[in-house]
Amino acid sequence: MSSGSAGAPALSNNSTNSVAKEKSGNISGDEYLSQEEEVFDGNDIENNETKVYEESLDLDLERSNRQVWLVRLPMFLAEKWRDRNNLHGQELGKIRINKDGSKITLLLNENDNDSIPHEYDLELTKKVVENEYVFTEQNLKKYQQRKKELEADPEKQRQAYLKKQEREEELKKKQQQQKRRNNRKKFNHRVMTDRDGRDRYIPYVKTIPKKTAIVGTVCHECQVMPSMNDPNYHKIVEQRRNIVKLNNKERITTLDETVGVTMSHTGMSMRSDNSNFLKVGREKAKSNIKSIRMPKKEILDYLFKLFDEYDYWSLKGLKERTRQPEAHLKECLDKVATLVKKGPYAFKYTLRPEYKKLKEEERKATLGELADEQTGSAGDNAQGDAEADLEDEIEMEDVV
């Protein structure tokens, strides 16, 4: 397999992207459009048949019956074959095909670089291909001669580059002015109007002829992959792993409170436990109700009423019911209640033992009064019933 058939030359849109050569004063070899030349559409061949170079329409079909394979190469192999040292028609490798056509192998020459695999598996991705061709194009002899002269003289090439930059700036200004004057008259049907109302003109250039030829007709589309049996295959895999490691995504690392290591250069606000750095949570709703301090006597009476309802209260619950500042509420709580530290009612307040006794005595006294009232009412009811029975037992006599 030679380099000419392995890599297809790039296609060039020759008919649409072309310029004309300026008649005088052009030492750079670049093609410019002079003011004296007539501007015409190089794509409109029917109306400008006599003005187009005949060479630009010639297509070499000598190798049109030649069958070529369109191959997709790995990046490292394509870069090696793209080197100019490998583009002199020398043999790059051989293709080995089994008799039944089940396996196709590409073998590179042994004298090539040992850093890449020499054995590849070639897979047919599309066996039958229609209407695909490979083209090549070259400059005509007069343009090739100018190119060789510039390559032979570096100083002349440098002057040509500087001259090219100056002429490009001048050419842009002249072309813009010329288009505004002439293009509207000659190509009214080619003028387009943008949304902002300004006219936009399609650029018209003169076609530069190229020597175009068909390299061959594509008959198969293939893909080349390194063979796992090749000893250099593991080198390619290792290179890819290193590329992946170097291109890792950025990670977010949270700061820990390790004294003298990660937090040594941070401020006091970052080191304290109250820091909100990287903390996720909902913001607390701000209460618009302001707490007004009540007299201690009223708070104590209200606390006794609350402890009559439930024996155990949390500080949060008492604060919601009393609506007092926490410091003021704690000061009053410490006088009548104690905080439970263990058990099922841990971290809740309950009345002190002495107040519990008074509470029980008051409850018993209240229950005793209720019992006496119930007993007195029961005696009155019994006496009334006895008097009613006596009245029933007295016999009444009729007086005549």
Curated annotation (Swiss-Prot):
UniProt GO molecular function: DNA binding; nucleotide binding; RNA polymerase II complex binding
UniProt xrefs under CDD domains: TFIIF_beta (cd07980)
Feature: compositional bias, Acidic residues: 33-47, 386-400
Compartments it resides in: Nucleus
Any Pfam family: TFIIF_beta
Region Disordered, residue ranges: 1-47, 165-194, 366-400
The keyword Nucleotide-binding appears for this protein: yes
Signal peptide segment: none
Protein's UniProt keywords contain Transport: no
Gene Ontology cellular component list: nucleus; transcription factor TFIIF complex
Modified residues (Phosphoserine): S28, S34, S56
GO BP term (any one): transcriptional start site selection at RNA polymerase II promoter
Comp. bias (Basic residues): 174-189
Gene3D superfamilies membership: Winged helix-like DNA-binding domain superfamily/Winged helix DNA-binding domain (1.10.10.10)
Biased composition (Polar residues): 1-19
Keywords: DNA-binding, Nucleotide-binding, Nucleus, Phosphoprotein, Transcription, Transcription regulation
Family: Belongs to the TFIIF beta subunit family.
Subunit text: TFIIF is composed of three different subunits: TFG1/RAP74, TFG2/RAP30 and TAF14.
Its biological purpose: TFIIF is a general transcription initiation factor that binds to RNA polymerase II. Its functions include the recruitment of RNA polymerase II to the promoter bound DNA-TBP-TFIIB complex, decreasing the affinity of RNA polymerase II for non-specific DNA, allowing for the subsequent recruitment of TFIIE and TFIIH, and facilitating RNA polymerase II elongation.
Misc: Present with 520 molecules/cell in log phase SD medium.
Name of the protein in its database record: Transcription initiation factor IIF subunit beta
